[in-house]
Amino acid sequence: MTDSLPRNKALAPFAPLIGEWKMSATHPMLPGEHFHGTASFAWLDEGAFFVWRSSLDDPRFPTGVAIFGSDDERHEYFMLYFDERGVSRKYDVAIEGNTIRWSRNAPKLSQRNTWTIAADGRSVAGKGEMSR
């Protein structure tokens, strides 16, 4: 067995997100309010997976971590999420050009999110939707 794994080439579209980001966000259930925080993105195990850590400066929003991966046989992406409340969720992920979408359909809470990476790579615009 070798000490390092090869990079998962299917996750290459996530590379522009690597690093630390400042966040400014809104929430569909809290119209007119703006929230700030941080997000960081990094490779896990030399690129076998991609990790997202997020935290908003408002106690109403949990600090969370997500791991992105792929299924090479099905040509699909997924995200596994966990936060400080003990909530864990699985999301389906789609990548097209500079746009990353993740979603889940569940009886109690369905969610959709879209991130669009700017052409210059200096910002990411996100939009979230949810239904209960």
List the model feature ranges, each with a label.
Residues 1-132:
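Hydrophobic small-molecule pocket/channel-lining residues, especially in calycin-type beta-barrels
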